[in-house]
Amino acid sequence: MNNLENIVEQLKRNRVVAYPTEAVFGLGCNPNNESAVRALLKLKKRPEEKGLILIAPTKELLLPYIDENKLTAAHWQIFETPSERAITWVMPAKKAVPQYLTGQFDTIAVRLCCIPAVIDLCERTGFALTSTSCNLTGQEPCRTADEVKLQFGADFPVLEAETAGKTNPSEIRDIFTQHIFRQG
């Protein structure tokens, strides 16, 4: 990860960056900065109503967004139990979480992601990351840093590291019902 410090600096400056996740590269930014999130939505041509996924290596970085009062110890156990596949959990959002993150919902999609690149980025920035697949509309998600540069240009900030090699994107499930919104 030769350019880790540069990517950390870009995130701290509220820029959108590309970084590896479990299966594909993600586009991410500081979820606490509205202009950064709006730049991400514009880049992806993604409607705000859809909401975004937040990822972090620890529950603590995701707690500012989750309404803990609506969850039991059993829900937390489900959330924190390691799985072979990446699972994004739809959880109740705190009322203060902005609509540009939740979209049209009163929930927030969150995932514990413990691959080295995400751990390094979150530890060095001190915040969770937004995560949406790194691709332009109509194109396949990028699986390498080189593919990111081909789609977004040679100057686009991309962390030079590898994905965890998973085949499919994360599964998306409801924390209360276990309903699967997207198969992983």
Swiss-Prot record:
Keywords per UniProt: ATP-binding, Cytoplasm, Nucleotide-binding, Nucleotidyltransferase, Transferase, tRNA processing
Catalysed reaction equations from the record: L-threonine + hydrogencarbonate + ATP = L-threonylcarbamoyladenylate + diphosphate + H2O
Disulfide bond positions: none
Record-listed E.C. numbers: 2.7.7.87
Pfam families (alphabetical): Sua5_yciO_yrdC (PF01300)
The keyword Cell cycle is assigned to this record: no
MF terms in GO: ATP binding; double-stranded RNA binding; L-threonylcarbamoyladenylate synthase; tRNA binding
Gene Ontology CC terms: cytoplasm
Keyword Amino-acid biosynthesis listed: no
Biological process (GO), any one: tRNA threonylcarbamoyladenosine modification
PROSITE patterns xref list: YRDC
EC class (word): transferase
Cellular localisation: Cytoplasm
Ranges of residues in domain YrdC-like: 1-184
Function of the molecule: Required for the formation of a threonylcarbamoyl group on adenosine at position 37 (t(6)A37) in tRNAs that read codons beginning with adenine. Catalyzes the conversion of L-threonine, HCO(3)(-)/CO(2) and ATP to give threonylcarbamoyl-AMP (TC-AMP) as the acyladenylate intermediate, with the release of diphosphate.
Similarity section: Belongs to the SUA5 family. TsaC subfamily.
UniProt-recorded name of the protein: Threonylcarbamoyl-AMP synthase
